């Protein structure tokens, strides 16, 4: 009798634990962040194709798309373009691009976007083809129509302030309900590469609202993960679906951050004696790369530390190639040979360990992540059906 009673208690405990686990997963807020990096967007594009393919297999649904699984998708520069591609609706109110269309997009349009014959002395490219293809693909779609929350950064050079385009901010700032093609060009308009972008919208009172924007990396550097997280936490104050992460409860967050590779240049060491002899030109050649790489490392370090301190390290995954070499380091080398190399970098990255301390490969980690995303979606769908 005592044995039977103990067995029943054990069953109840298991059921209670399982129920708690499911409830916890259902409450999770999911965030995807995509770095900037020009043509190197092929690398996260390859990763996204793998992840979406896994979700389609798990849910036995060839029409499954990343926007169905993430509450917030954020990006800067080329990451902002990828964000728009997988969240902007087509005529059927589904993302106009599947993840497996991202890499072919770069191969088709990259050589025309980064065509040196269109450049001028003070910038490398005129940006006309980039704007043309953005208008063609994104049409008249505006921020409010995105299929999930987005976070795309840019920087206004007239006001010297970052401009962040999100759905949740439109109630307070309706003038930021801009056309997606204007936003995508702006976040990609890296100084010395493309011209800054001017356009105007209207305020709630009908007044003209002018924007003079450049690359989002000026505002958030290349890694927009903290921006994407902050958009999610801010939305938690108003949206019940995000309530679980109020008070910065990162235990209730799943964060996937995709990089475009670090450069070998940053791995070169310099001594104080050597750099003391440098002039402005020598510093200019390396300081931007050093600053961007250091900031990206610090973002990853901060997020890793926070999730580890909360014993939730499996809730955060940073996918990054360290380091790139040769032509793959260039943000604007859209030669077919280099794009093939970048695609191979992405494929090879899947087989590499997550870190020195974690032998799990990125492929295994992404499959685990996909399982969490799939299970969470099913739990929410079941709850909604009652």
Swiss-Prot record:
Record's signal peptide: 1-23
Residue numbers annotated as active site: 77 (nucleophile), 215 (proton acceptor)
Gene3D superfamilies, per the entry: Cytosolic phospholipase A2 catalytic domain (3.40.1090.10)
- A Pfam family that this protein carries is Patatin
EC number assigned by the record: 3.1.1.-
The protein's matches in PROSITE patterns, at most eight in alphabetical order, are given as: PNPLA
UniProt motif GXSXG: location: 75-79
Q: What else is on record for this protein?
A: Patatin have a dual role as a somatic storage protein and as an enzyme involved in host resistance. This tuber protein represents approximately 40% of the total protein in mature tubers.
Domain notes, please?
The nitrogen atoms of the two glycine residues in the GGXR motif define the oxyanion hole, and stabilize the oxyanion that forms during the nucleophilic attack by the catalytic serine during substrate cleavage.
Q: Which family does it belong to?
A: Belongs to the patatin family.
Protein name per UniProt: Patatin-16
Q: What species was this sequence derived from?
A: Solanum tuberosum (Potato)
């Amino acid at each position: 009798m005592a044995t039977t009673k103990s067995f029943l208690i054990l069953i109840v405990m298991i059921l209670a634990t399982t129920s708690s686990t499911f409830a916890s997963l259902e409450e999770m807020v999911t965030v995807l962040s995509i770095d900037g990096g020009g043509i190197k967007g092929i690398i996260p594009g390859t990763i996204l194709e793998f992840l979406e393919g896994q979700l389609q297999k798990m849910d036995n649904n060839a029409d499954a798309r990343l926007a169905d699984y993430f509450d917030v998708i954020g990006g800067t520069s080329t990451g902002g373009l990828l964000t728009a591609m997988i969240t902007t609706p087509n005529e059927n109110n589904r993302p106009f691009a599947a993840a497996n269309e991202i890499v072919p997009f770069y191969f088709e349009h990259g050589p025309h976007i980064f065509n040196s014959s269109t450049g001028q002395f003070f910038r490398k490219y005129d940006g006309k083809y980039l704007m043309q293809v953005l208008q063609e693909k994104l049409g008249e779609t505006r921020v409010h129509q995105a299929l999930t929350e987005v976070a795309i950064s840019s920087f206004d050079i007239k006001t010297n302030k970052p401009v962040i385009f999100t759905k949740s901010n439109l109630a307070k700032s309706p003038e930021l309900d801009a056309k997606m093609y204007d936003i995508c060009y702006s976040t990609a308009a890296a100084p010395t590469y493309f011209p800054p972008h001017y356009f105007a919208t209207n305020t709630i009172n009908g007044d003209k609202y002018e924007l003079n924007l450049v690359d989002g990396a000026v505002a958030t550097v290349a890694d927009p993960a903290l921006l994407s997280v902050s958009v999610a936490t801010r939305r938690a104050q108003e949206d019940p679906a995000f309530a679980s992460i109020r008070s910065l409860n990162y235990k209730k967050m799943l964060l996937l951050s995709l990089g475009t590779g670090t450069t070998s240049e940053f791995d070169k060491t310099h001594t104080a004696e050597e750099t003391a002899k440098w002039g402005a030109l020598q510093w200019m050649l390396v300081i931007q790369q050093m600053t961007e790489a250091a900031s990206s490392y610090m973002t990853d370090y901060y997020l890793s530390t926070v999730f580890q301190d909360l014993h939730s390290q499996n809730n955060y995954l940073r996918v990054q190639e360290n380091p790139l070499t040769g032509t793959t380091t260039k943000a604007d080398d859209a030669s077919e040979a280099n794009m093939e190399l970048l695609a191979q970098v992405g494929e090879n990255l899947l087989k590499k360990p997550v870190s020195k301390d974690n032998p799990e490969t990125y492929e295994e980690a992404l499959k685990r992540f996909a399982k969490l995303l799939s299970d969470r979606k099913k739990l929410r769908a079941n709850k909604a059906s009652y």
